[in-house]
Amino acid sequence: MVLNLQAKWQWMGLLLAALLCCSGCQSLLPKAQGLTTTAWLAQDYQRQDQLEVQWNKHSFSFLLYQQQQGQKLDMLALSLTGQQLFKLSFDGQNVQVEQRIEPMKLLPFEFVVRDILYATYPNFAQLQPQNVQIKNVAQTQSIFINQQHVLNIKHQDAVIELDNLQVPYQMVISALHDRLETTE
């Protein structure tokens, strides 16, 4: 009886240690440096694009709608057939994922948001602290954060190509010129 109880306590201790280790794994994932900014401005902003993402042997193609009213920037992704893929918001400090479909559960949204903002948001790089450096060569911007090369952005007409060197993934952003208008 005492031996059985001792074995249970050892098992519980191992289980607790494993749970603590696993919960710590999330904090070991790299954070998207260069995303948060204390200079985030309240403004009205709207943009619509078609995105193609190549990540981890997966390929996603979707429409992305960005809309900011005040401090909160919302991003909504729809499949080309209209299915909602994910919805998130960014307030200058945090990315809050509100909804996402199962195949996108592991997509590194902090990096995706950061890279989209560097590529499309007006003057986003200027909102960053001095640890962010941008080197321009021809049509390509190289983004360095804490002296580490993290992102390449190539502008070609209405197409922007992103190459994230940290995660890694590639993204092509094509601007939609026939914008959907909202009436209120």
Model-derived features: positions:
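Short linear interaction motif-like sites in intrinsically disordered regions of transcription factors
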Residues: 10-12, 41, 56
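Mature, soluble, non-transmembrane domains
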Residues: 26-28, 50-52, 83, 87, ...
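Bacterial Sec signal peptide processing site at the extreme N-terminus
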Residues: 19-41
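Post-signal-peptide N-terminal segment of Sec-exported extracytoplasmic proteins
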Residues: 43-79
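Sec-dependent bacterial lipoprotein signal peptides
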Residues: 1-27
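A generic local structural motif
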Residues: 4-6, 61, 147
